[in-house]
Regions:
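Active-site-adjacent "subsite" loops/lids of carbohydrate-active enzymes
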Residues: 57-72, 76, 135, 151-199
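Aromatic-lined carbohydrate-binding/catalytic grooves of carbohydrate-active enzymes
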Residues: 91-127, 217-226
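Substrate-binding cleft of secreted/luminal carbohydrate-active enzymes
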Residues: 287-298, 313-317, 323, 328-399
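Aromatic-lined carbohydrate-recognition surfaces of secreted/lumenal glycan-active proteins
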Residues: 70, 145-149, 153, 209, ...
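Catalytic domains of carbohydrate-active enzymes, especially glycoside hydrolases
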Residues: 82-105, 202-207, 289, 365-371
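An active-site-proximal structural segment forming one wall of the substrate-binding cleft
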Residues: 80, 86-91, 136, 178-213, ...
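Active-site-proximal loop/short-helix segments
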Residues: 154-162, 203-235
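Glycine-rich, aromatic-flanked loop segments that form ligand/cofactor-binding clefts
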Residues: 95-100, 126-174, 207-211
């Protein structure tokens, strides 16, 4: 079995390197069809065919246990990526979760999806050589996962107001930090996300992950001013989320890539939908992987009986994941639970999250038999001492049998 996996990985690497031509090695662009992206590299904005993508995805085997870092688009598109690759080379990390469309609505790379081109999502791309960078990850044994933010997309909301949450007094509704949201009742919002995800898989990402698969979590008085134009009579927020995560799964399933969802950590504890449309049983019935965000700093005072949940990384994560496991078992769900763990300090909230607090969360998960996880730091800054060193093959005999 190990030999088969080694051969499959070698085939994936060979195919990726053989077919990689870079994003902009396809033809000559006429004058005036480029603009300066954020990194000051001239990037094509005209409608284009994704000729650097494959007609069919080339999928390799996923690691038996995924130990991943969240990598934001800026980090992926800059020299910081090489620092993170080196960190993975030297530690237990074997996967990166990369922002392909983040909560600004901007794309990681130029997209051929018509809606992305129409709304200007290609005007703020983060890298000009995504395919070459993906090839590098594959060469280093790093499993690439594409992350897509769905409902919090101010760029889409501004350019497609008919797809957006409206204010009862007119214009776009905005959250407490002034961000416009798209209407999670609207089918087109989710179809757009599915189109982008299919494109990413054909580019070389091995798995897709959807975040903000929900309605806004805002104070009641602000939500009372929100109007959702696409809501059907009698349709609840839960109905909309459940139908649309199924749509995402069905649109991606033919490509063979795992379909995964990030959800609130409290979803496994709640009896309702938290006012955002997320119910644990709905996700485990649809997803290949569910990723509850069990950050101790995000739990309310008194959660699980702790006055300061942020100061209890081991016990909060253990309680949260035990509830998730307990709710999944009666359903016989095959969905994997792969938690997001806190690798950041929230403001001035103490304690500061050092390698000790991070390892305590990992220990809590692993003691429950959950051996896959993702570390979240919004700046993609990680502490080496929070990670175990990479296990190396002990000798030629182990190498010849395929290694790990």
């Amino acid at each position: 079995m190990r030999l088969v996996r080694r051969q499959a990985s070698a085939l994936l690497l060979w195919a990726a390197l053989f077919t990689s031509r870079g994003l902009f090695a396809q033809g000559i662009l006429p004058p005036g069809d480029t603009v300066a992206a954020a990194d000051q590299v001239k990037v094509a904005l005209r409608p284009m065919e994704l000729r650097y993508a494959q007609p069919q995805p080339i999928l390799g085997p996923a690691p038996a246990s995924i130990k991943a870092l969240y990598v934001n688009a800026w980090a992926f598109g800059s020299s910081k990526l090489w620092q993170l690759v080196r960190l993975a080379d030297e530690t237990e990390i074997n996967a990166f979760v990369v922002d392909v469309k983040d909560d600004t609505g901007c794309m990681l790379y130029p997209s051929a999806v018509p809606t992305a081109q129409e709304i200007g999502a290609n005007a703020c791309v983060r890298t000009k050589d995504a395919r070459a960078r993906l090839d590098t990850l594959v060469a280093h044994g790093i499993y690439p996962i594409a992350r897509f933010v769905v409902a919090k997309d101010p760029l889409l909301a501004e350019h497609k107001p008919g797809w957006s949450v409206q204010h009862r007094d007119g214009g776009l509704w905005r959250d407490r930090i002034g961000m416009a949201w798209v209407d999670a009742y609207n089918d087109s919002v989710w179809i757009y996300a599915a189109q982008l995800a299919r494109e990413a898989v054909k580019l070389g990402f091995q798995e897709v992950q959807f975040d903000y698969v929900r309605f806004p979590d805002e104070p009641r008085e602000r939500l009372e001013t929100a109007v959702f134009p696409a809501r059907r009579p009698g349709q609840s927020q839960r109905d909309a989320v459940r139908a649309h995560i199924t749509l995402l799964r069905d649109r991606l399933r033919p490509l063979g890539a795992p379909v995964t969802f990030d959800i609130f950590g409290l979803t496994a504890s709640a009896t309702g939908d938290l006012g955002i449309g997320q119910v644990w049983e709905d996700f485990i019935a649809v997803a290949d992987v569910v990723l509850p965000m069990v950050y101790p700093s995000h739990y309310y005072r008194g959660a699980y009986g702790f006055a300061r949940p942020n100061a209890e990384p081991y016990r909060v994560v253990r309680n949260a994941l035990r509830e998730a496991l307990d709710r999944s078992r009666p359903r016989g769900s095959s969905a994997e639970i792969r938690p997001y763990l806190q690798a950041f300090t929230l403001g001035r909230r103490l304690p500061r999250y050092t390698p000790f607090e991070i390892r305590e969360q990992i220990r809590a998960a692993e003691e429950l038999g959950i051996t896959s996880w993702v570390l979240w730091n919004p700046r993609s800054v990680y502490q080496r001492d929070s990670l175990r060193p990479k296990r190396r093959p002990s000798g030629p005999a182990q190498l010849s049998s395929g290694g790990e």
